[in-house]
Amino acid sequence: MSDIKFIEGGISIDYRGQISHVNDLNMEEIERFYIIHQHDTSIIRAWHAHQHEKKWFYVVKGSFTGAFVKIDNWENPSSGLKPEIFHLSAQESRILLVPEGYANGFKANEPDSVLLVFSNKILSVAIND
């Protein structure tokens, strides 16, 4: 069974507009965030692997497909590892939590998609992970 999980949120709409939320997100571990603006749907941003960094992914605009591989051996990973594929959309207000130990890659499904990424490591630590 996968260690990757969704944290479900919701979308509330009335005459004033729309609120997208993920009220069950516990932000105690989060040290930083960054935003990816993916204009081109032909570009794949991959493979970023982190032994110790945990990440939370939230689509602000558009949609993305993410592929994640649990690394079995950091010195000599197996070549036959199978990716887990997840689809994320701004139309579904939820966060994908990917624990440490995974390689990841993303592809925007729509032009000008925006992905918000939270991390449990500051940049100076994450760069060396």
Where do the protein language model's features map onto the residues?
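Conserved metal-binding segment of the jelly-roll/cupin
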Residues: 88-111
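Non-catalytic, conserved peripheral segments adjacent to functional cores
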Residues: 1-91, 111-114, 118-129
